[in-house]
């Protein structure tokens, strides 16, 4: 098979011409604009493809020459002449296609990472920028800010909204934007539209925020990124929960919708708004509804049905409020927030975009209403069914046969006209004067007992309320509405009506008269409080009739409450006794002086220092006498019988004709008394020490033990001749006493006379007489003892 060389020669020529055209086009484009990195990459790929196509052809001498010529023409510029053979040899070899592509990718990466230098507005960086660059930057900033707000206006806005911000809010972008939003609203409402203030341009939130950040010192750190902060704030605000209300009329046929002031077109929605920080959801709904409509549903209803939906990644919760009067004058409480407020029929509202609107609703948009319409219609239908069912049950219900139905016969409701609509009573906010006036008590003449219908059968003199147990029975012959006022000489409970001061009339039966006032002795320091007749009952205090026991309150209020002096030896007698309130009242009487009787803990004291005292911390407490004597150990003489003895309960004495108890619980320890036999006994020492601690605790503490108190009480009141035996002390005390019969009791150890052994101390007397005798020779060394 022969291959013609002419065809092979033609193909390279055509390809070379095509490649020349491509190279010329690329060179023309490069003269117009510099090639980008992408264009360079495409060109290198095209060249690599052409090279691969040529390499697939058969290798002959002529194609090789043509290929070299084609490469030289493609690489040479359009205006430059074709290089000669010598110049071709001098040209350096170019890198491979892969190396060139890697280099181009590296250059593109470096060009993308480089950012244009930003000119700083701080004072320290102004020296690094030239004057033209600074001037251009200021011109750009001036165009960015828009109309300039006066400086004094910015100062006032900073004082109102920025100066009071805490540090944590200043460092929070979102909280700063919330404060700037409030400042912008205040600027538009009170400064731009005020004729008295001139030079306040109407700027948008973007320009306003930038000027405030430039003016306020604490917000200057946000000036260079005001757009970024504002974008984050708008994104965050779209996720803040929204709360509002669905206001429905009493018939539940119509609902209130509002139109925003800046809304484009006739867009309608429910009154709602964003919740504030740390605000309860229901309070936020009440606040937003009141700001947009002037209707405060917080005083109209206590519990509402809630509807909740998520719209554009934001939660919207609405509270359905029923029985809203249709004649209420809705007025927005904020400026430039609500344009219109109207009633719409619930059944005519669309539930989807494809629903056809009635003719009178054509042109209106309900995009923010449609997600809730279907749920509202279902709820309204159920409520209407419940209302019809209740009316039917009320008509078919029969009166009950209980006793209350006989006492209170059911009366038919007044006729209601057909055209009348059920309305809920209107309430208003009370002022402080109206609120406190409601707690004032009416005069005594205006207070009356509740009236009841006639009973069947009628019984003369029967108090219906007393039979039912509602009120206290009245005094026979007293009128239902006649009450006596409270006396002026003492404070009384003014919450109930007064009544006569007759005790039998107050409680309905005669009170027992066997309760007597405690007798006060002549030496009592409160003798001026005593009445003339000591056995007369206490003076009755006037009180009024009521369900509370006011006699108890008045008795406590009028009883003298003076504390006893600590040095008083008079009997402690209560000043008032509430015997009718206690099942078995305590009636302490004055105790006459009697002979002392041994008690459970030792000998009884004299009557003057052994009285019963009703104190706050103990039911019965023995009052310690103030005539205690401090006697040194084994040095003082025995006291006389005329003086008052110590009030210690651990003393031991013997009374003529009465048995005595010798207990080893003296205040003198065995160590100080020097009793060897007691110390030597193994168990006696522990028993003596325990009894000393018990006596010291009961004497020095605020109250004595229950066992000692009960024994002391019986000893003081009964005064029996037979001593009261204590089983606790009887078991061991008598055993110790039998062992120590030959010893001197510890409690009387200090009463013995002291005798010094003179012979043991100074020696025999004969020795001293011999030493100082004139007959004996005088010794220079002095007396010497044997």
UniProtKB/Swiss-Prot annotation:
<keyword id="KW-0464">Manganese</keyword>
<dbReference type="GO" id="GO:0030145">
    <property type="term" value="F:manganese ion binding"/>
</dbReference>
<feature type="region of interest" description="Disordered">
    <location>
        <begin position="623"/>
        <end position="655"/>
    </location>
</feature>
<feature type="compositionally biased region" description="Low complexity">
    <location>
        <begin position="134"/>
        <end position="144"/>
    </location>
</feature>
<feature type="compositionally biased region" description="Polar residues">
    <location>
        <begin position="646"/>
        <end position="655"/>
    </location>
</feature>
<feature type="binding site">
    <location>
        <position position="292"/>
    </location>
    <ligand>
        <name>Mg(2+)</name>
    </ligand>
</feature>
<feature type="domain" description="Nudix hydrolase">
    <location>
        <begin position="238"/>
        <end position="366"/>
    </location>
</feature>
<feature type="compositionally biased region" description="Polar residues">
    <location>
        <begin position="101"/>
        <end position="111"/>
    </location>
</feature>
<dbReference type="GO" id="GO:0003723">
    <property type="term" value="F:RNA binding"/>
</dbReference>
<feature type="compositionally biased region" description="Basic residues">
    <location>
        <begin position="62"/>
        <end position="72"/>
    </location>
</feature>
<feature type="region of interest" description="Disordered">
    <location>
        <begin position="25"/>
        <end position="148"/>
    </location>
</feature>
<comment type="function">
    <text>Decapping metalloenzyme that catalyzes the cleavage of the cap structure on mRNAs. Removes the 7-methyl guanine cap structure from mRNA molecules, yielding a 5'-phosphorylated mRNA fragment and 7m-GDP. RNA-decapping enzyme although it does not bind the RNA cap. May contribute to gene regulation in multiple RNA pathways including monomethylguanosine- and trimethylguanosine-capped RNAs. In oocytes, may play a role in the response to stress induced by heat shock, osmotic stress and anoxia. Required for the developmental axon guidance and regrowth of PLM touch receptor neurons.</text>
</comment>
<keyword id="KW-0460">Magnesium</keyword>
<keyword id="KW-0866">Nonsense-mediated mRNA decay</keyword>
<protein>
    <recommendedName>
        <fullName>m7GpppN-mRNA hydrolase dcap-2</fullName>
        <ecNumber>3.6.1.62</ecNumber>
    </recommendedName>
</protein>
<feature type="compositionally biased region" description="Polar residues">
    <location>
        <begin position="118"/>
        <end position="133"/>
    </location>
</feature>
<dbReference type="GO" id="GO:0006979">
    <property type="term" value="P:response to oxidative stress"/>
</dbReference>
<dbReference type="GO" id="GO:0009411">
    <property type="term" value="P:response to UV"/>
</dbReference>
<dbReference type="GO" id="GO:0022414">
    <property type="term" value="P:reproductive process"/>
</dbReference>
<dbReference type="GO" id="GO:0009408">
    <property type="term" value="P:response to heat"/>
</dbReference>
<dbReference type="GO" id="GO:0000932">
    <property type="term" value="C:P-body"/>
</dbReference>
<dbReference type="InterPro" id="IPR000086">
    <property type="entry name" value="NUDIX_hydrolase_dom"/>
</dbReference>
<keyword id="KW-0963">Cytoplasm</keyword>
<feature type="region of interest" description="Disordered">
    <location>
        <begin position="556"/>
        <end position="576"/>
    </location>
</feature>
<dbReference type="GO" id="GO:0043186">
    <property type="term" value="C:P granule"/>
</dbReference>
<dbReference type="GO" id="GO:0002119">
    <property type="term" value="P:nematode larval development"/>
</dbReference>
<dbReference type="GO" id="GO:0006397">
    <property type="term" value="P:mRNA processing"/>
</dbReference>
<dbReference type="GO" id="GO:0000184">
    <property type="term" value="P:nuclear-transcribed mRNA catabolic process, nonsense-mediated decay"/>
</dbReference>
<dbReference type="GO" id="GO:0005737">
    <property type="term" value="C:cytoplasm"/>
</dbReference>
<keyword id="KW-0694">RNA-binding</keyword>
<dbReference type="InterPro" id="IPR015797">
    <property type="entry name" value="NUDIX_hydrolase-like_dom_sf"/>
</dbReference>
<dbReference type="GO" id="GO:0000290">
    <property type="term" value="P:deadenylation-dependent decapping of nuclear-transcribed mRNA"/>
</dbReference>
<dbReference type="InterPro" id="IPR036189">
    <property type="entry name" value="DCP2_BoxA_sf"/>
</dbReference>
<comment type="similarity">
    <text>Belongs to the Nudix hydrolase family. DCP2 subfamily.</text>
</comment>
<keyword id="KW-0378">Hydrolase</keyword>
<dbReference type="GO" id="GO:0140933">
    <property type="term" value="F:5'-(N(7)-methylguanosine 5'-triphospho)-[mRNA] hydrolase activity"/>
</dbReference>
<dbReference type="GO" id="GO:0140932">
    <property type="term" value="F:5'-(N(7)-methyl 5'-triphosphoguanosine)-[mRNA] diphosphatase activity"/>
</dbReference>
<feature type="binding site">
    <location>
        <position position="288"/>
    </location>
    <ligand>
        <name>Mg(2+)</name>
    </ligand>
</feature>
<dbReference type="GO" id="GO:0048471">
    <property type="term" value="C:perinuclear region of cytoplasm"/>
</dbReference>
<dbReference type="GO" id="GO:0008340">
    <property type="term" value="P:determination of adult lifespan"/>
</dbReference>
<feature type="short sequence motif" description="Nudix box">
    <location>
        <begin position="273"/>
        <end position="294"/>
    </location>
</feature>
<dbReference type="InterPro" id="IPR020084">
    <property type="entry name" value="NUDIX_hydrolase_CS"/>
</dbReference>
């Amino acid at each position: 098979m022969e291959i013609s060389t002419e065809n092979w020669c033609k193909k390279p020529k055509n390809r070379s011409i095509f490649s020349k055209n491509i190279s010329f086009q690329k060179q023309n484009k490069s003269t117009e604009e510099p090639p980008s990195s992408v264009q360079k990459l495409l060109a290198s790929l095209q060249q690599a493809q052409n090279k691969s196509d040529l390499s697939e052809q058969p290798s002959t001498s002529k194609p090789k020459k043509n290929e070299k010529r084609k490469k030289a023409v493609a690489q040479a510029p359009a205006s430059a002449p074709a290089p000669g053979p010598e110049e071709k040899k001098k040209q350096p070899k170019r890198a491979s296609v892969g190396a060139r592509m890697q280099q181009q990718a590296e250059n593109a990466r470096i060009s993308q990472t480089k950012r244009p230098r930003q000119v700083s507005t701080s004072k320290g960086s102004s020296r690094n920028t030239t004057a033209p660059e600074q001037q251009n930057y200021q011109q750009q900033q001036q165009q960015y800010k828009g109309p300039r707000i006066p400086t004094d206006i910015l100062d006032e806005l900073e004082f109102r909204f920025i100066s009071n911000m805490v540090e944590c809010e200043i460092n929070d972008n979102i909280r700063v934007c919330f404060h700037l939003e409030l400042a912008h609203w205040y600027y538009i409402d009170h400064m731009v539209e005020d004729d008295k203030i001139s030079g306040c341009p109407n700027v948008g939130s973007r320009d306003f925020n930038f000027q405030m950040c430039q003016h306020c010192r604490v917000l200057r750190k946000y000036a260079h990124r005001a757009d970024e902060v504002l974008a984050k704030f708008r994104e965050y605000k779209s996720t803040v929960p929204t709360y509002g209300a669905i206001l429905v009329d009493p018939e539940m046929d119509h609902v209130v919708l509002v139109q925003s002031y800046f809304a484009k077109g006739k867009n309608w929605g429910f009154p709602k708004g964003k919740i504030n920080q740390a605000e309860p959801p229901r309070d936020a709904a009440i606040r937003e509804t009141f700001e947009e409509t002037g209707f405060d549903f917080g005083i109209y209803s206590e519990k509402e049905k809630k509807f909740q939906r998520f719209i554009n990644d934001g939660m919207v919760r609405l509270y359905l409020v029923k029985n809203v009067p249709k004649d209420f004058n809705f007025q927005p409480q904020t400026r430039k927030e609500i344009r219109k407020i109207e009633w719409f029929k619930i059944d005519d509202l669309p539930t989807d975009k494809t629903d056809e609107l009635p003719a009178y609703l054509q042109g209106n948009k309900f995009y923010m209403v449609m997600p809730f319409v279907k749920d509202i219609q279902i709820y309204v239908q159920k409520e209407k069914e419940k209302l019809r069912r209740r009316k039917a049950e009320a008509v078919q219900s029969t009166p009950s046969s209980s006793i209350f139905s006989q006492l209170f016969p059911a009366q038919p409701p007044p006729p209601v006209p057909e055209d009348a609509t059920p309305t809920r009573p209107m309430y208003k906010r009370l002022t402080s004067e109206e609120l406190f006036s409601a707690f004032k008590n009416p005069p005594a003449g205006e207070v009356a007992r509740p009236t009841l219908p006639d009973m069947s059968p009628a019984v003369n003199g029967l108090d219906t309320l007393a039979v039912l147990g509602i009120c206290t029975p009245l005094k026979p012959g007293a009128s239902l509405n006649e009450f006596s006022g409270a006396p002026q000489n003492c404070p009384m409970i003014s919450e109930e009506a007064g009544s006569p001061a007759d005790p039998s009339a107050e409680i309905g039966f005669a009170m027992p008269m066997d309760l007597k006032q405690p007798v006060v002795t002549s030496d009592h320091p409160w003798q001026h409080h005593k009445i003339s007749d000591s056995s007369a009952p206490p003076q009755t205090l006037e009180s009024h009739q009521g369900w509370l026991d006011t006699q108890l309150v008045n008795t406590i209020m009028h009883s003298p409450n003076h504390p006893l002096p600590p040095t008083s030896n008079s009997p402690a007698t209560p000043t008032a006794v509430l015997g009718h309130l206690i099942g078995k009242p305590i009636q302490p009487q004055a105790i006459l002086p009697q002979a002392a009787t041994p008690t459970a803990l030792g000998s009884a004291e004299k009557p003057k220092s052994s009285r019963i005292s009703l104190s706050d911390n103990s039911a019965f407490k023995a009052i310690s006498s103030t005539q205690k004597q401090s006697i040194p150990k084994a040095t003082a003489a025995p006291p006389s019988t005329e003086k008052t003895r110590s009030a210690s309960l651990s003393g031991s004495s013997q009374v003529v004709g009465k048995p005595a108890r010798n207990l080893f619980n003296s205040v003198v320890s065995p160590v100080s008394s020097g009793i060897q036999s007691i110390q030597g006994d193994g168990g006696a020492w522990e028993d003596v020490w325990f009894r000393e601690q018990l006596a010291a605790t009961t004497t020095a503490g605020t109250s004595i033990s229950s066992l000692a108190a009960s024994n002391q009480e019986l000893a003081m009141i009964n005064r029996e001749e037979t001593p009261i035996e204590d089983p606790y002390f009887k078991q061991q005390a008598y055993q110790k006493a039998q062992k120590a019969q030959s010893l001197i009791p510890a409690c009387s150890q200090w009463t013995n006379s002291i005798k010094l052994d003179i012979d043991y101390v100074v020696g025999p007397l004969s020795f001293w007489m011999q030493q100082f005798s004139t007959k004996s020779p005088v010794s220079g060394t002095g007396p010497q003892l044997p």
